[in-house]
Amino acid sequence: MLTMKYLTCFFILLYAFIDNSSAQETVFDPSYTLWYGQPAEEWEEALPVGNGRLGAMIFGRFDEERIQLNEETYWTGGPYSTVVEGGYKYLPEIQEYIFKGKPLEAHRLFGRHLMAYPVEQQKYQSSADLFLFFENGSEIRDYKRWLDLKTGIVHVEYRDGDILYKREIFSSAPDQAIIIRLSSDKKNKISFRAQLRGVRNLAHSNYATDYFRMDAVGSDALMVNGKSADYLGVEGKIRYRVQLKALNEEGEMRTEGTFLVVDNADAVTLCIVAATNFVSYNDVSADQIERVDDYLRKIAGKSYDDIRSAAVLDYRSFFDRVELDLPYSENSYLPTDKRMIALENNTDHSLAALAYNFGRYILISSSRPGTQPANLQGIWNEDMNPSWDSKYTTNINTEMNYWAVESANLSECAEPLITMVKELTDQGSEVAREHYGAGGWVFHQNTDIWRVAAPMDGPTWGTFTTGGAWLTTHLWEHYLYTLDRDYLRDVYPVIKGSVEFFMDFLVEHPNGKWLVTNPSNSPENPPDGPGYNYFFDEVTGMYYFTTIFYGSTIDMQILHDLFGYYIKAAEILGKDMFFAEEVRLARQRLVPPLVGSDGTLQEWTEDYGQLEDKHRHFSHLYGLYPGNIISVKKTPELIDACKAVLEQRGDGGTGFSRGWKMALWARLYDGNRSYRIFKGYIKEQAYPQLFAKCYTPLQVDGTLGVCAGISEMLVQSHEGVIHLLPALPDEWDKGKFSGVCVRGGFELSFEWEKNKITDAKIISRAGETCTIKIGSDCQILTSGRRIRKKEIADGIFEFETDAGTLYNIEIE
């Protein structure tokens, strides 16, 4: 194919011709670089770096640089419980109210006796800000800042008069530090004042329960020491320390009060380390000062080049596994913010590749083995009272953060989520017993670093009892991609525990035929049914609607998946056959997907409409995506009803809503619609550095949902068949996708031109039978030897594989 490489060369020559200063111009790779011609004015425009634990947002200012800092375990509060003892005594009455069509009575009783105490969770906090003050001249020009996704480094460059100034900023995983390098092309030109500032929580009811102290440490270091805030009666038990250590090359360096002053250096390297006393959700016994000192000891004596090389090598060991390239156009070489504006009326397919690659970057930067999972904002947060507390919301958002993790060949990055699910079983088993009188474990729609599990916020949100079940499906997905039986044995008790709860919790529908969850809800969306009136909620102190019901469609679909996964796990491991049979019989009695009188898939067991028909969630389409109950192949009779839901709710909404819609339309094989939604997302619900908006607050769920949606457009594997280009937009007539993973333990690389596969390669990691839909006849070869294949349907081939072997697919 006429590769992107040749197009890149063409546009480099074009820009050289039209730009008089071309000798000094940098032409960025459009699929792997976010770049801008001006500094960030707002936090939402800053560029992120992260190593899974330490995050920073870089503004790139030339007069007063701000680098906002986060350490992932700095939260309000401390270990606490939300369990309400004896709440289960009220459950039968609540269930009776719901079955009798008295939702407000059920809502109030649930609010009084089954809601968590305290009713809200804790907040993720900002750790500190680093400010660098420069005395620039009046001739600032040739400014640019960029994030290189191939290295994970943010760059800032500008000229002041005849001097070229450069900065490099990255977050090193090997050295657990944020590194800032300042240099210029002339000697003795680096001068600035630096201040490391703490941040206070000024806006909540426990004002003045947090504190910090700013100090200089010798002549070359600054530090902030502090304590987290109390919140909702939970004592702040996090102690933290952030320390900056400077190394100058030539020039002079000193501290003045809380400032570090550098004069006339050739270059300066700033090393920022941070730590808290957090050990786990129930242990805060570490010494944050010892941890910081240990980080500094380990990095002492290393050169900047060595630190940089180690960080880039580590980062690339994740990022370089996958490559997505789509055709470039002239607009592809615009600054990223201008590309986003131009997309509405111009061709720029590679912007989708950039969005996909940025999603992988965010996963690598916010979720590494041994860290916390990515929260609503990943690991980046400037506010002490952030939107939705920057917590873990599990009625869509946390799950969406990890939809792409396996296919994006970042399986290790799922480890923090898997660990969190295991940890939730601790308090989750208490909630199951005390709130519901059930065995196993349960978790609802919100949690925090302390792994609380009871219903949070209010009954309108908290009655989502399948949040833990949904998270548990991710444990099974990890197995499907890896086929690691040792891992499956490890998580089997977690999967079984979730199933055990619902086997106790499910009750018979009044028709005597179905089993349903009760109470239940369809996340955040009230049904348009009898008794669902606007009312004053005593738990939240708000006028609102109740969502409480029984047997919501999403509940039934999640449990259909969960029960099926458990049955398969028990069979694979040879465990609990009698219990697995009970689960199989219960699964058969779950409410099937139903089509309402308006032609849409019903959101509830009863044929009710929605009070918000443009709602941002698509809960009742879980079975289409990310679930596997509904598909064009298996349930063609439901496809029109699913499309009717998507048409009813439209292509707009929040960032996360649009990411979900992209994947849903991809499962319906309509790539043109998915791409149309992507364009609308870029125009209306993405910040200039491709972070998603949830209305206006920055969140990573939409960023990562879009990443998953793009992957789903190009390859699917949820039905046991590797389906290449299932939802390819007509405009993406050629491209390359390499290193992507699919279920069954396979890694794929393929190229296409004129909307048809031209080349494909498969690595078998587990030695399983490979079934692939490629759309053309082909030959399978390994080491030049032809492999026997069987055509099991039109364009679908099956062949045996050996673990660790590469197979070439030659298209005929």
Where are these predicted regions, by residue range?
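Bacterial Sec-dependent N-terminal signal peptides
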Residues: 1-25
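Non-catalytic carbohydrate-binding regions of carbohydrate-active enzymes
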Residues: 477-478, 482, 486-487, 498-508, ...
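Short, surface-exposed recognition loops and adjoining beta-strand edges that mediate ligand/DNA contacts
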Residues: 35, 373-391, 502, 508-525, ...
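Aromatic-residue-lined binding/catalytic grooves and analogous aromatic/hydrophobic interfacial grooves
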Residues: 24-460, 466, 475-479, 496-499, ...
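Short, solvent-exposed positions on alpha-helices
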Residues: 190, 350, 412-415, 485-493, ...
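Acidic/His metal-coordination segments adjacent to aromatic residues that form catalytic metal sites
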Residues: 378-389, 443-463, 520-550, 684-696
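Acidic/histidine-rich catalytic neighborhood
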Residues: 497, 501-569
